[in-house]
Amino acid sequence: DCPSDWSSYEGHCYRVFQQEMTWDDAEKFCTQQHTGGHLVSFRSSEEVDFLVSILKFDLFWMGWRDIWNERRLQWSDGTKVNYKAWSAEPECIVCRATDNQWLSTSCSKTHNVVCKF
């Protein structure tokens, strides 16, 4: 069972906050809302559809950051990538609800927040 003000889907609880903040602030905010809380993550397109049905805005942070730095990259010759020269600005992911597109953007930008536990 989810607390009041939270919505339930497939054993998880979700809460939509129509307040914009940076990714770091949003993730910290979600951890403070409920034990085990984090920015929303998705395991299926049905989960996305559920969330979109309760949203009142388009763009929101997802719990995924540093997409390029976290990937296990390798060069075309098969050798491991040990040297990286990405831009200094870390990238985080927002979801655009109107068409369920995931977009890479600066983590320092502000977007709405959806928490999940």
UniProtKB/Swiss-Prot annotation:
SUPFAM superfamilies: C-type lectin-like
Single GO BP term: venom-mediated suppression of platelet aggregation
Gene3D superfamilies: Mannose-Binding Protein A, subunit A
Keyword Transit peptide appears in the UniProt entry: no
Location (main, coarse): secreted
Family classification: Belongs to the snaclec family.
Protein name: Snaclec CHH-B subunit beta
Lineage: Eukaryota, Metazoa, Chordata, Craniata, Vertebrata
